[in-house]
A protein has these predicted regions:
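Active-site-adjacent structural elements that line small-molecule/cofactor binding pockets in enzymes
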Residues: 1-121
């Protein structure tokens, strides 16, 4: 199962429904894998990070960012805020995390890699 959001709480509820439905169909929950696709921007200025996501969403999809955010998981802000955001989905059941990085990919990859042990605990 590979959804794109919208938030960790809803993802967790849907994850539980996914597992329950699979078990009722005779599937072993240990055989199920769940991923999540999230859009993040890491910047010290949270407002600037969120604005960069909005700009990206508008240019990529040609739709209002508020509409896209209503069903896509997005977070802009400090590395601590972004890690907490990602951890919410992991805690709710995501086995794999796919990140769309908005901004300087190399810098964000280094920041996330330096703290990777915190992401998937």
């Amino acid at each position: 199962w590979f959804p794109i959001g919208p938030d960790a709480e809803t993802f967790g509820q849907r994850q539980q429904h996914f597992v329950t439905t699979a078990v009722k169909a005779g599937r072993d929950p240990a055989d199920l894998t769940t991923a999540i696709y999230l859009t993040v921007a890491i910047k010290a200025d949270a407002a600037a990070a969120e604005a960069s996501i909005d700009h990206y969403l508008h240019n990529y999809y040609g739709a209002p960012p508020a509409v896209m955010r209503s069903f896509q998981g997005c977070c802009g802000g400090s590395i601590d805020k972004v890690i907490a955001f990602i951890r919410g989905y992991v805690t709710a059941g995501a086995n794999h995390v796919v990140l769309r990085l908005v901004g300087d990919h190399e810098v964000m990859l280094r920041e996330l890699a330096a703290r990777r042990d915190e992401l998937m605990q």
